[in-house]
Structures are given as C-alpha cells and as structure tokens.
Amino acid sequence: MSSTQEDQPNPDFEIDHPEAYSQYFLTAPREISFYLNLLVKRGSLLTAHIDDGKAFFLTTMIAVDDEKQAIFLDSAQADELNTAAKNAHRITLTAKLDRVKIQLRLPPLRHQLVDGQKMLVAAFPQAILRIQRREFFRLESSSAHPILCRIAMEAPEGTLKTFEWNVADISGGGLSLNAPTSLINDCQRDALFKNSRLDIPGEGVLLVNLRVRKTSEFSAENGQHYLRVGCEFVELPGSRLAMIERYIARIERERKARDSGLAN
C-alpha cells in the first residue's frame, strides 16, 4: 500500500522536536537494537515517510543485522516509491508498539536482493523516539493475580528493612503502591527506593528504581487506612520497560476478550 498527500500539509514529526521530547529519545546502542528486533519479532506495520512525508508507503521490518548495524525492510509495491526512497535525503519510520508511538529517522535506503527477495536496506538509526507519557494509560492491578513489589529501606542503624506491597496500578512511566500508614515518613516525595523487586505475573521479576512523586491516604473496603504511594521509574532499561508494556497489553487483551464473551 502506498500513497501521497499532495493537498495536505507536511506531517509534523515529534522526532524533529528534540527539545520538547528529549525524555523519550533512546540513544544507547543496546536499546536501539532491542526495539529494532522487537519490531521484527512482532511483525509491526510501519509507515515509511519519504523526505517531508507527503509521499509514504507501508512496510514491515524483515530482519536486523546487529553485527553490520543494518535493517532490512519490505520494499514498496510501487517501483516509483522504491526509487524515491533510494534517492531521498531521509526516511522517517513510524509505528505503534504496545500502545507506544515509535519514530526513527533513517538515511537514504538502498536496494538489495536477499534470498531472491527485493528489500530496502538502511543503517541503524542514531536514536529511536518512543512516546508514552504516564498519564496516557494506567492499568489497575488484578486482585486475583496481584503485582507485588518488594521495597528495601535503610534503617537509621544502617541495616536494611524490606517490605512487600501490592501494586495498585502500573504504566510505562511508573506505578502506585499500597503501603501501611505507619511508613508515611519513609514515603515522602523524592524518596528513592533502589533495586526494588517487581514481581509481574507471567513476566517474571524485574529490578527497578522507584522515586516517590506523591503520597496520599485512602480507606479500603475493609475500613482500614493505607497509603497510596505514587512512584516513577528511574533509569528503567528499555528491555524492562518492554516487559511492563507487554504485560499491560496482555491483560488488556484478556479483559476485552472477557467483556466481549470470547473468554471464560
């Protein structure tokens, strides 16, 4: 599938505004490789925008060569678009991956035959933009299969004390914890919980750093009072973020299936 937008204004890509979206750029080679390979594994549909974006075509990422730092894309159906992509100054790829907007900028593409299949080949991008603000979507933890978080705090005498709290909700940007009110002094804003163990059903245990952003008190259905401790992830590697996003997407699919009567 291909198209042009002759009568439409040029698309405005977030990747062209690093000053506004700096926190969403991934530049570490390992993270770039991880997401490129994830696009291949998922068979994600990408839109390849040529130069200013008025001409574009749909494609998929067929393979990634980490050693040669090259990506292989399915060619466009129209030969003129393949030629335009080869002669372009830049190519902007856009996609959605588990509710997250992905953008990356490629140099001009070249044609290459791989096992008799015509492909478009480009070098690895220098950065990947992944946009998911925390407020976009939060998943409430299931009471049947709760997410647990083990927190380690340093006591005044220098020893470590550990607590295991239920996660109330989780997103790609952070989570909320249910904690006893007796620990309110340990859960003040900007408190940092390093190497917390996040046990996500079906995914495994992740080590995460959490910074407290907000603490409030609430009453549970049983009448007891608890703290709701809102935290953000700090320096979360892309591979661990992908596990969290995969869990969120899976639970949402299961809930939608139950709501539509497709699952018991």
From Swiss-Prot:
Gene Ontology biological-process entries: bacterial-type flagellum-dependent cell motility; regulation of bacterial-type flagellum-dependent cell motility by regulation of motor speed
Compartments reported by the entry: Bacterial flagellum basal body
Pfam families the record matches: PilZ (PF07238), PilZN (PF07317)
UniProt entry keywords in alphabetical sequence: Bacterial flagellum, c-di-GMP, Nucleotide-binding
Sequence ranges assigned to domain PilZ in this UniProt record: 132-249
InterPro entries documented for this protein: PilZ_domain, Split_barrel_FMN-bd, T3SS_YcgR, T3SS_YcgR_PilZN
GO cellular component: bacterial-type flagellum basal body
Function: Acts as a flagellar brake, regulating swimming and swarming in a bis-(3'-5') cyclic diguanylic acid (c-di-GMP)-dependent manner. Binds 1 c-di-GMP dimer per subunit. Increasing levels of c-di-GMP lead to decreased motility.
Family classification: Belongs to the YcgR family.
SUBUNIT field: Monomer. Interacts with the flagellar basal bodies.
Name recorded for this polypeptide: Flagellar brake protein YcgR 1
The species this protein was found in: Dechloromonas aromatica (strain RCB)
Gene: ycgR1
